[in-house]
């Protein structure tokens, strides 16, 4: 099977998890990843490498869901995944590592770099996908929106734009430069 990182309905995720086989070797890689990911190290980066068809995307998707922990038909992903640990050498240790993920909330961004424009480099591509995952634009407008989010001003901005533009919502205005730029200027003059 080819793993599509964009398929994320509950049924599709459940089916992919049911088909995932956690070998001792994969469990060791999972443990190494969780050790680094849950450490105090800042800006942990991970690079998955392997031959074509070796299961990198599948493993990455399972990691993403373990971190994000979505509910699948009323049961958390981590709870469903825990059945994969039964019988492994380090079952209890890995279970504790997975449980430690609950200490924080994460924003997981899964994307296939082969299907995304990477003409401006991997950092730009990853940032664009991050912005899209937050429901923001994947351009300079998205950077402004993200700045407003970080400063707890985004909701005020949305209300102000709607008020200043005869009830038109920002999500509709931002699609067109002819409407987004004037709306941005008016609102930013008030907010900043």
Where does each model-flagged region fall?
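N-terminal pre-Walker A segment at the start of P-loop NTPase domains
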Residues: 13-39, 85-88
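Short coil/loop residues immediately preceding or within conserved phosphate-binding loops
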Residues: 43
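P-loop NTPase motor core
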Residues: 17-20, 46-51, 58-188
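Extended, charged/polar low-complexity intrinsically disordered regions
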Residues: 1-19
